[in-house]
Amino acid sequence: MSAMRTGRICTLVVGMVVLGGQMLRAEGQAPTAPQPHQEHAFVTPDGVTWQVGPASLPPGAQFAVLEGDPKHTGLFTMRLRLPATYRIPAHWHPADEHVTVISGTFNMGTGDVLDLAKGKALPTGSFALMPAQMHHFAWTSEETVLQLHGVGPWQINYLNPADDPRMR
């Protein structure tokens, strides 16, 4: 083997060992980002405090923030209680939306207009993920409770400005 080739192989082996060592060392380290929670939290169904709104949804909804603050930067978890025959027109969010159906059936579809023929029924226990900026809509046929988890500040942007209840 030539000296040049032997040198290249040695350099490659040393590089792999150094990289592997860095990866193993990094696995044992604590996260570098500060952890936002200092204490645990338990919320039972009878401990949920419902409020009217939010104003960004059509009238009839109720919400309860379980942790975090959807208006500020960071993780949050909230619940939405929606009445039967509730409609949320086509909209999008600047961050991923994680939805878990706690009770009832939530219907969701993708597209630029609310179309009851193009949705998916999500019964109790279902989970949905809508990626950031995905145009979607939703509706209920019975009272439904959802758990929404995301990263704030949370926003809802209606495709048709006339659908935005904040503009009325």
What are these language model-derived features?
Residues 1-6:
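N-terminal secretory signal peptides that target proteins for export/translocation
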Residues 10-21:
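Bacterial N-terminal signal peptides
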Residues 27-76, 163-168:
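A short, N-terminal "cap"/entry segment at the start of jelly-roll beta-barrel domains
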Residues 39-41, 117-120, 139-168:
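Double-stranded beta-helix
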Residues 83-86, 93-113:
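Glycine- and acidic-residue-biased ligand/ion/polar-headgroup-sensing regions
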Residues 88-90, 108-109, 130, 135-141:
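Short beta-strand His + acidic residue motifs that chelate non-heme Fe in jelly-roll/DSBH
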Residues 112-132:
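Short acidic-glycine-tyrosine-enriched beta hairpin
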